[in-house]
Amino acid sequence: MNNKVKILGDKIAEARFKRKFLPKISKSLISNPNIAAQICRHAEMELLWNPIGFKAGATNKSMWKKLKAKKPFFSYLYEESTYKNKGKMPFQSNLIGAELEVAFKIKNEVFNFNKKITKSNVSKFIIGIAPAIEVVGFRQKLKAIDCLGRMISDFGLNVAFVTGKLTKYSLKKITSISTVLTNNTAKKNYPGNTKIVLGNPINSLIWLLNEIRKNNMILSFDFWVTTGSSTPIIPIKKGDLFSGSVKGLGSVSLKIS
């Protein structure tokens, strides 16, 4: 790991911990997804927060051409940025928006499994499924996503995470189900579908489980995986109340106070 990676990782970790903004990082330093991933891994190591799972990002293939992406990315989810269903989180000026996702609770036994995770064996590691809202934002002074590496290096843009009730659900039924993220304050509905998540949230889950095992990112407890947004990113204002519904899975809500 070179010195520039360490310096940028340190700065991004400090910005997240102290909830402060960094000046815009030069695109040339983070445009390579592999370098951006190294920056993220170092920032995660320096943050010293408590991981509770992982998030997959860039799972909507229709965005890959714009982002020049060849595959998704992943980063940690943290206890310190997790909120209770129907709870409140403080507004932050760096917020981009809210997303509605499908989340899985996974047995940590998956790390002892010596074979590749596939559709035929993944179900043995799934404890349950839940709807989830992820709030995303920057730790830098900028207004829009200009490259994939900026998303990857900045903790995958994760700011907050909340899940609804965990439930059992047939994996065969999750391929294409309707979702709706609602801004109750603005009285606007934003429909979506799980099929935009790599064609199926299970595909995203399988990809992520194989990636974290390959990178030796082992957790000693059962953990969460969010698979990517089933809706557009919905802008956030202070006072907004968001509720999300995934057909057959239930609902989840979060107030931005």
Where are these regions (language model features)?
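Catalytic-core "active-site belt" of small-molecule-metabolizing enzymes
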Residues: 2-200, 206, 233, 238-241, ...
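A conserved acidic, glycine/proline-rich C-terminal tail/linker
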Residues: 201-233
